[in-house]
Amino acid sequence: KLYLMSQIDHSLSLASPVPRNFNAVQRIGLASVGAGLALLTVAIFGAAAAREGSFFWGAITLISLGGIAFSWSTYMQEAAGIKNNGVMFFSETARGALGWVFGVIITTFYILLYFYPAELGYSADGNTGLVALFDPLSYLLKGTPASQWFMYGTFYTLSILILGFKYILKYRHSRYHIIRTSSVMFFQTAFAFLIPEFMARLNQTAELKEAGMTVPYYDFKNVWPLNYYNFEGYRIDTMTDPTFNSLTNNLGFIMLLVGVGSVFFLSPLLTYFFGKRWYCSWVCGCGGLAETAGDPFRHLSDKSLKAWRIERWLIHSVLVFIVIMTIASVYAYLRDNGADYWINADVFVGMVATTLLGLTIALWTRRKLFATVQTDIKVVASILMVAITGLTVYTHLFGENGLVFFAQPYKIYSLYAFLIGAVFSGVIGVGFYPLMGSRVWCRFGCPMAAILGLQQRFFSRFRITTNGGQCISCGNCSTYCEMGIDVRAYAQRGQNIVRASCVGCGVCAAVCPRGVLSLENGPNTDNSRMDEVRF
């Protein structure tokens, strides 16, 4: 007697890995999104009709309404609660063929965006192709033709809004996730997209045109070192120019004040009270895209010890790189223009030396605070800080021919902009979502995350508390940690979690079936934190 074993399901899972058939609303939603993408594809090949405003608004409307309809029908037909059914089996979310194809498409788009914008249709003599499709919206907001960056900003914002709506429906039972997602949607739309474009419209005023000045792009929520370009000489010249400020109601001084104040006051203060989550999960555009568009891929983050070691050294290497680049840029500017400011090159070198040597001394004398930092890390950090200090002083005393750190400052800046600002944060950071998870850039390369992580690690009240007695070791928390933290290992020991890499997204607590984890603020004393900290 023959048995067809392939027809017998031996699984005890209540959730079938085989995707269900889509209902009518879902099919209509997918068809609408497909039609919108088809219009974008037509625009890529330079169809004349693509330059019509109706073509652009039609594509955006079809994609938006289709995404909303599909999300609503997917999540609102069932009871509230996180459902990741089949995510480990679907080809697009399990590093299958569709996942690789999706990754290649995104990576190719970013390569064209950063290095070959003409292939997307951007031209100073008149846009064509895909970029030309966005001219109507660009004229509406700032009165000039679209650039590849305007096109990208529109795509980026639209993705966060549509998929943020989907995320809210999925996590609608969690007040924390609703508010957090609404926050990143607001900051991306208002601060990263609309306000900079409205500011760019000032460039069309007769006064600024007559003065030959332009308002530099400025995203008020971007904080150094994420906006590594903010303290470049040309921007400082514009922000401190009396004529520019008189024509823009002191906009330049406001931008400079926000840029400096956010680095030295706002960011450390908020990180002390709330941890790095205030920025990485509530404000940052990179984090916003990772939490919304990247949500289906969060389980792909590598949880291995090897990945953690690479992460630790790589992200802090990027931080060292941008510190060197910023010191070189600011010093070169003050060396040539220091007479115009109370902070001249002498004062700046003194500030750098005092800060870095002070941190080096504290690393070895504040034993309770830095007790869990391994000796090899202390040694490497000390050598780097002393070396940077020595090179800065040497450059100031003996440097010649405009060199800083034995190189032209603009070359250091260009190298960072290419390797980190373009390749790492863009091409790899987003293009590898379907392969390495949604926080590749945030975990391995973002210098802002590195600085906030160090503050969170040693000086913040934020931690994830655990009730180990309730843990059943299901592993959901570790599986869906997009930063690759083995949360379960802490929960099993009943050990509170204070990790430099944790962005406080709260998904580990949301997927826990026993309520073991809780995001809290606690006392910040050396003795109370030592038993709960793991670097």
List where the protein language model places each region.
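Non-ligating segments of multi-cofactor redox enzymes
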Residues: K1-Q495, A500, G515-F535
